[in-house]
């Protein structure tokens, strides 16, 4: 995902347009739309798209600041390892996880209670990567 959305699409749009709304926004919106799964997520599908859109904007920011997709790729890798191999939802992608949550993507009440923690971890990961880029 990072190679296409940040490594290719963001770079191509950045070479053609000056506005960050274009070269950060378009790849982030497309990234978010790619995470729309109403069959699996039910009424949570839209909030998951919002989560993915914010994640896309943060990764676009890292790519722009670093001048390479390396930091965004690293943060995305850590996010996916955590979500798929450490603690996962009990769905088709969670088969290798060490722990499963007691709720699935379609459980609106439980997932919405958990999402603020996930949003906070996303922001902390982004800030840590930005701090590392300063050094």
Predicted regions and their residues:
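Transmembrane helix-loop-helix hairpins at the membrane interface
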Residues: 1-135
């Amino acid at each position: 995902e990072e190679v296409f959305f940040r490594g290719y699409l963001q770079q191509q749009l950045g070479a053609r347009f000056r506005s960050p709304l274009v070269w950060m926004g378009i790849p982030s919106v497309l990234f978010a739309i790619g995470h729309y799964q109403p069959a699996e997520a039910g009424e949570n599908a839209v909030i998951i798209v919002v989560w993915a859109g914010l994640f896309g904007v943060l990764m676009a920011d890292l790519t722009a600041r670093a001048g390479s997709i390396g930091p965004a790729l690293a943060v995305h890798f850590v996010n996916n390892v955590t979500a798929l191999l450490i603690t996962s939802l009990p769905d088709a992608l969670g088969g290798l996880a060490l722990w499963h949550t007691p709720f699935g993507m379609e459980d609106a009440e439980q997932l919405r209670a958990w999402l603020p923690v996930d949003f906070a971890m996303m922001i902390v990961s982004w800030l840590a990567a930005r701090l590392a880029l300063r050094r």
